[in-house]
Structure formats: C-alpha cells, structure tokens
C-alpha cells in the first residue's frame, strides 16, 4: 500500500492551492466569514461555488458526460480537502451525496437536467428527511405524496432542512404507500425532487446554538411531477440509505482540523505565559497538539482508504458499516480536537467572532460549536454504532 500522494496528486494539490489563492480574494474571504447569514453577506456563497463550477473544478471526479473531468474519487477528495484549507465553500451534500445517487438511480432525463447544472455550480439541493416525529426513526416519516394524474400532491412537514436559503430543490423522502406499517414501513417510501419555488412550499428558519442555521419546511398541497420521482415508487429506501452513506463520509474531512491545529500551534509559538515561557514549550500544550495531529492523520487515512476503494461516482459508495464507522470516528474526533485546541488557547477561546478579545477571530470556538451537530446530522452516532454492530460484526439489532 502506498500511504502518500502520487506525483500526479501532488501536482494536483499545487494546482488547486494556486487556484484557491486566486479565487479567495481578501474581499471574498471577508464576505464569506461575515456573521451576517450562514455563509456570509449577500449571494457570495452561491457566486463562489458558481465560479468553481465555471472553472471546471467543482465536480472534477465526475464522468465527463456529466460535466466532470473524469478523475478519480481520490482526486475529488483532494479537491475537497484543499477547498477546506483555503476556506472555500463546497456544497458537499449536493456534489458528494445527491448527485452520485442521481447517477446511480436517476432516469436519463434527470441525469441530463440535474447533473450538468450541479457540476456548473448553478443548482443546489437541501435534504428533506427528518420530521418532528421521525428523526432517528426515519422510516416512520408521515409526509405523504398522493398520485393525482401526472403529479404527486405532497403534504407534510420536515425538520432540520439545512441550507434551504440557498437551495433550488429539496431531495424529499415521502410516504407513497400509507398502508405500509410495522417492520415493512420503509417499503412505502419514495424520493421526490421538489422545487423550492413550488406553490404550497414554505420554510421558517431555526436558529441553533451551534452556529449554522437550519429550517423547518412545509408542504401544503405541493404538486410535484411524477417525472421528478427518483427510482421506483415505494422503493425509495435504498436511495435514502445510499445518499446517507455518501453524506456520512462527506461530513468528516480532516482539513478544517489541520487548519485550526496550524493556527493554534503558531499562536502558541508566539505567545508567552506569565512567567515568560513560550506556551509551545509546555509539555501539556505539546501533548494536546500531538493528540490532535495524530488522530487527524488517522482520519485522513480512513478517508483515503474509502476514496481509493471507489471506482467513481457511479459506484454504490462505501458500505453502510464503513460509512458509519468513518462518521462516528470523524465527528467525535472533531469535537475532541477542537476542545483540546481551545484548552491551549485558554478561557479567551470561548469568545465568539467579533467579540473583544476573541482569539484567532473566534474560528476555533465556532468550529467547536458547529461540529457538535455533525454527531447527529446524517444519523445519530448511537444509530451508527448499531449499524456497525449489525452489518460489520453480525450482532443482533438493538431494541429501541
């Protein structure tokens, strides 16, 4: 096994770093980091992504017929990591989870319409799965879609629909067979692509302590063409699980951790304690930084292994057990890593961005708050452990 970048991958990293240095101007970086809105001032989030799409980078790991460069999943991972290092926004759910599911299960017409627009950075998705009474128990969802001629009529409510303010469509799980119940309730689920401009669709913001906002979305007699159903009717559960497997891996890039580690290390090298000793020379500081570095390296290798095992975006993706294992390790590592880095910074590390005395622009504090949501976004880590036990270890299903 080669546990390093190939010469070609090193060249790609250099090319991407040069590209992002030009893309992320001081003005764009400042606008994206503003506390106004989840991803900065005005339309800078979508404009930045559209620029990456026009430049051909956003979907470089996709087949050329869909607007990509036909590169490997490893190259796509390198792009994701370099974007994170540069602070450039990437629509992970759209690019890395919804789009591969469309490639695997969508009709030719759906592929022709959605995929080139996603690759161009012009089309964004939100995920509509969780409901007030169906979060962890997703198969218990109650949002209905009733067939009426060439349309479905959708009624219901979803929770935790993130990035809805930027979305053109919602990837929506609905119940098309109300008769399914008990152990077979997952068999009555279908997936629809719902325009956010559809009559009867609305949403309200949900502000969180973690920092990133999310939303509640509402569907009141929303008419969705049958042509917008992905896969067969009542057979949407495999699409949901396929998308979630991709999502769980997309949540756990180590690049932001390495970025914060570098900033904290440099700060400790240039900051002295009350006795005049550099903080970096304290053993406990060195241990904290070393623990973060070592575990982030392990996460990087996990992602490399997952990317190397995929033949491309049309691949079925990681196994449920591998996706869940990466998600549990990566999200819990992030929480612990930012906590250890905040210990090094001291009490001022708890001050938020733009607060007087905030260290490193409040970046580590914000990342610590934001990463907490990842332990249950895409499926709670408790359920991920159940999946690992059942699929990888052959243990019986947990009683919940």
Curated annotation (Swiss-Prot):
BP-aspect Gene Ontology terms: cholesterol catabolic process
Outcome after substituting residue 247 to A: Loss of dehydrogenase activity
Cofactor binding note of this UniProt entry: Binds 1 FAD per heterodimer.
Catalytic residues (positions): 247
EC top class, as a word: oxidoreductase
Annotated residues for binding of FAD: 127-130, 136, 162, 380-382
Induction text: Induced by cholesterol and repressed by KstR.
Keywords: Cholesterol metabolism, FAD, Flavoprotein, Lipid degradation, Lipid metabolism, Oxidoreductase, Steroid metabolism, Sterol metabolism, Virulence
Cofactor: FAD
Regulation: Uncompetitively inhibited by high concentration of 3-OCS-CoA.
Pathway(s) per entry: Steroid metabolism; cholesterol degradation
One example GO MF annotation: oxidoreductase activity, acting on the CH-CH group of donors
Pfam families named in the record: Acyl-CoA_dh_1 (PF00441), Acyl-CoA_dh_M (PF02770), Acyl-CoA_dh_N (PF02771)
Organism superkingdom: Bacteria
Catalysed transformations (reactions): (25S)-3-oxocholest-4-en-26-oyl-CoA + A = 3-oxo-cholest-4,24-dien-26-oyl-CoA + AH2
Keyword Cytoplasm annotated: no
EC number per UniProt: 1.3.99.-
The keyword Metal-binding is assigned to this record: no
InterPro entries for the chain: Acyl-CoA_Oxase/DH_mid-dom (IPR006091), Acyl-CoA_Oxase/DH_mid-dom_sf (IPR046373), AcylCo_DH-like_C (IPR036250), AcylCo_DH/oxidase_C (IPR009075), AcylCoA_DH/ox_N (IPR013786), AcylCoA_DH/ox_N_sf (IPR037069), AcylCoA_DH/oxidase_NM_dom_sf (IPR009100), Mycobact_Acyl-CoA_DH (IPR052161)
Family per record: Belongs to the acyl-CoA dehydrogenase family.
Subunit structure, as described in the record: Heterotetramer (dimer of heterodimers) composed of FadE26 and FadE27.
Function: Involved in the first cycle of side chain dehydrogenation in the beta-oxidation of cholesterol catabolism. It contributes partly to the virulence by increasing the efficiency of beta-oxidation. Catalyzes the dehydrogenation of acyl-CoA ester side chains of (25S)-3-oxo-cholest-4-en-26-oyl-CoA (3-OCS-CoA) to yield (24E)-3-oxo-cholest-4,24-dien-26-oyl-CoA. Also able to dehydrogenate steroyl-CoA such as 3-oxo-chol-4-en-24-oyl-CoA (3-OCO-CoA) as well as 3-oxo-4-pregnene-20-carboxyl-CoA (3-OPC-CoA). It dehydrogenates only (25S)-OCS-CoA diastereomer.
Protein name listed in UniProt: Acyl-CoA dehydrogenase FadE26
Gene: fadE26
